């Protein structure tokens, strides 16, 4: 496996991560922030 193969394979991993993982983490942090604000 050389660098060019890894570079062409990388977007297939990154696109779902950016598309699903990042919004999920953002929503989770926002939810925790709202919940902690409401309790205090």
UniProtKB/Swiss-Prot annotation:
Pfam families linked: PSI_8 (PF00796)
Residues that span the membrane, as ranges: 12-32
Cellular component terms per the entry's GO annotation: photosystem I; plasma membrane-derived thylakoid membrane
Keyword Transmembrane: yes
Claim: Phosphoprotein is one of the keywords in the record: no
Alphabetical list of InterPro entries matching this protein: PSI_PsaI, PSI_PsaI_sf
Any one of the GO BP annotations: photosynthesis
Keywords, sorted A to Z: Membrane, Photosynthesis, Photosystem I, Thylakoid, Transmembrane, Transmembrane helix
Places the protein is found: Cellular thylakoid membrane
Annotated membrane topology: Single-pass membrane protein
Family: Belongs to the PsaI family.
Name listed for the protein in its UniProt record: Photosystem I reaction center subunit VIII
Annotated source species: Synechocystis sp. (strain ATCC 27184 / PCC 6803 / Kazusa)
């Amino acid at each position: 496996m050389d660098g060019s193969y890894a570079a062409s394979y990388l977007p297939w991993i990154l696109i779902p991560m950016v598309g699903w993982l990042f919004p999920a983490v953002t929503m989770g942090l926002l939810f925790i922030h709202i919940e902690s604000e409401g309790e205090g």
